């Protein structure tokens, strides 16, 4: 009798297994074709732990602008076609704006309160609305541009006085901008403690959240029960990142609360910042401290990293392609002369500077693989099925290095954007997908809410650096130029945020008159704008 029960149970399990295999086979027949995988595990063995965007781009050249692969029983799709980005992520954004479940990101690190990882729900929409109100285009024009110009003026002064610290000046600048707008606290120098802490945390965060960097526990939950030391200590690494984030972000919330209390007790007025609006919202919407911390934290992360990295990439390109500097200088000199540095008001008269900014974003994007979307219901695309729950990757690297759109894509060539002189937000909203300049800000409802601030900051920073400085290769002991490594594999860091490895270059002012202008403008910026913000 016992043997009969065992046999019956075994047959039942076999039937269930065969049914699951048959169902999976039927679904796979309807999917967009992609690289063949193995039974049960799919393509897990083919996905590298670092720089997955390179593999995804390699597959796109074989399987086209939309293909799928399997991560165990789960389906993933990769979009490397700008027409499909517009059709799916933009026009069908209601279907494609969810996020995949991430045990590492949501449970171990952020507690589910990080805007980048949150699903498309009421809290996510409330957070997006709050960010938009403070960083929309009109607010940037009316309130934030004066700070952008003042901080980038200090950046010029820092490059002038400490040219050997060029890897730190852009980081200080962008961190100080976002810290001032979020919390009313500047980052006056490159060795300010909160700046060092943030960039250390972000480096760890970037590595642990890169596709393939941790075990696929969302697909195979049983992996959580395997001793983590056998799998790279992924739990400890994740928890350490989360602890660092919570400690740093929480410290700024507590400081803001204390500043509000002191101002109230002394009846003194103080400028309201983003955190003041969030703290007001906390009372109305019953937000937790963790939600408040990560709403400020996500803006701190995005505001600190993207702009600083892109300016460092631009300097790499200027050293390698000096002819770009020559054309930029001619444009800047015709508009500004030597007596003043460029400002945001010069935007329409400096189209080539805007082209340089766009080409920088395209050439070495800081996010070569956008954070994945998730499909919240079945969808049919060109006769193929994308089932509910599919993880959807926007392959930014592949889109930016598409030879049919950008001839000779490995060359830094601002003429790729000849005739496209509007801001990235305009092209992201355009119905003509061929006009889209780049995809560094994402797409659809997940478009970066800081796009308006970032665009203005990047232009101002690029214009001021090019107006004042000459960027050249460093010379070795024999007097030969030392080439900067811009190879996509060896020249940049690992992680979902990709930054240049430390490099050397020669930075020199273009003239004594320009150096004097920098110091005069910095003194004015310090006395009129920068002094309004607290320092640590």
Swiss-Prot record:
Its cofactor is heme. Its EC number is 1.-.-.-. The chain crosses the membrane at residues 2-22. It is found in: Membrane. The keyword Lipoprotein does not apply. CDD domains: CYP64-like (cd11065). Pathway: Secondary metabolite biosynthesis; terpenoid biosynthesis. Cytochrome P450 monooxygenase; part of the gene cluster that mediates the biosynthesis of macrophorins, isoprenoid epoxycyclohexenones containing cyclized drimane moieties. The first step of the pathway is the synthesis of 6-methylsalicylic acid (6-MSA) by the polyketide synthase macA. 6-MSA is then converted to m-cresol by the decarboxylase macB. The cytochrome P450 monooxygenase macC then catalyzes the oxidation of m-cresol to toluquinol. It comes from Penicillium terrestre. Its main location: membrane. It is a single-pass membrane protein. InterPro entries: Cyt_P450, Cyt_P450_E_grp-I, Cyt_P450_sf, Cytochrome_P450_fung. This is Cytochrome P450 monooxygenase macC. Keywords: Heme, Iron, Membrane, Metal-binding, Monooxygenase, Oxidoreductase, Transmembrane, Transmembrane helix. Gene3D superfamilies: Cytochrome P450. Belongs to the cytochrome P450 family. The keyword Cell division does not apply. The lineage of its organism: Eukaryota, Fungi, Dikarya, Ascomycota, Pezizomycotina.
């Amino acid at each position: 009798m016992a043997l009969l029960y065992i046999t019956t149970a075994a047959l039942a399990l076999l039937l269930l297994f065969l049914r699951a295999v048959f169902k999976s086979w039927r679904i796979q027949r309807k999917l967009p074709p992609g690289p063949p995988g193995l039974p049960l595990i799919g393509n897990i063995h083919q996905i590298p732990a670092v720089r997955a965007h390179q593999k995804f781009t390699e597959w796109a050249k074989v399987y086209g602008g939309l293909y799928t692969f399997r991560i165990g029983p789960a389906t993933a799709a990769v979009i490397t076609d700008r027409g499909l980005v517009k059709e799916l992520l933009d026009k069908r954004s209601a279907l494609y704006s969810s996020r995949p479940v991430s045990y590492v990101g949501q449970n171990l690190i952020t507690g589910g309160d990080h805007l980048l990882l949150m699903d498309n729900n009421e809290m996510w929409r409330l957070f997006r609305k709050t960010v938009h109100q403070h960083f929309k285009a009109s607010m940037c024009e009316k309130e934030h541009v004066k700070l952008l110009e003042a901080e980038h003026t200090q950046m010029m002064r820092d490059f002038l006085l400490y040219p050997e610290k060029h890897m730190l000046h852009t980081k200080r600048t962008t961190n100080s901008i976002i810290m001032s707008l979020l919390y009313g606290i500047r980052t006056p120098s490159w060795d300010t403690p909160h700046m060092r802490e943030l960039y250390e945390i972000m480096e760890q965060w970037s590595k642990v959240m890169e596709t393939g960097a941790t075990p696929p526990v969302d697909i195979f939950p049983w992996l959580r029960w395997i001793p983590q030391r056998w799998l790279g200590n992924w739990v400890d690494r994740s928890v350490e990142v989360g602890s660092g984030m919570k400690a740093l972000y929480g410290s700024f919330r507590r400081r803001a609360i204390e500043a509000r209390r002191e101002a109230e007790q002394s009846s003194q007025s103080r400028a309201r910042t983003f955190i003041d609006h969030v703290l007001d919202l906390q009372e109305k919407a019953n937000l937790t401290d963790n939600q408040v911390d990560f709403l400020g934290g996500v803006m701190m992360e995005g505001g600190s990293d993207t702009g600083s990295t892109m300016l460092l990439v631009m300097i790499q390109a200027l050293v390698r392609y000096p002819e770009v500097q020559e054309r930029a200088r001619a444009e800047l000199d015709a508009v500004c002369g030597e007596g003043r540095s460029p400002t945001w008001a010069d935007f329409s008269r400096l189209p080539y500077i805007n082209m340089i900014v766009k080409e920088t974003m395209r050439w070495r994007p800081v996010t070569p693989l956008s954070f994945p979307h998730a499909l919240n219901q079945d969808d049919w695309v060109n006769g193929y099925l994308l089932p509910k729950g599919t993880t959807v990757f926007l392959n930014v690297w592949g889109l930016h290095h598409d030879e049919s759109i950008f001839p000779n894509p490995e060359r830094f060539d601002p003429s790729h954007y000849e005739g496209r002189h509007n801001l990235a937000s305009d092209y992201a909203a355009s119905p003509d997908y061929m006009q889209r300049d780049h995809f560094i800000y994402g797409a659809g409802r997940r478009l970066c809410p800081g796009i308006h601030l970032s665009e203005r900051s990047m232009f101002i920073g690029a214009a001021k650096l090019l107006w004042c400085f000459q960027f050249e290769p460093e010379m070795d002991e024999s007097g030969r130029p030392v080439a900067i490594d811009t190879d996509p594999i060896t020249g940049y860091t690992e992680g979902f945020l990709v930054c240049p490895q430390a490099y050397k270059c020669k930075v020199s002012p273009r003239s004594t008159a320009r150096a004097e202008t920098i110091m005069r403008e910095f003194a004015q910026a310090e006395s009129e704008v920068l002094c309004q913000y607290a320092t640590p």
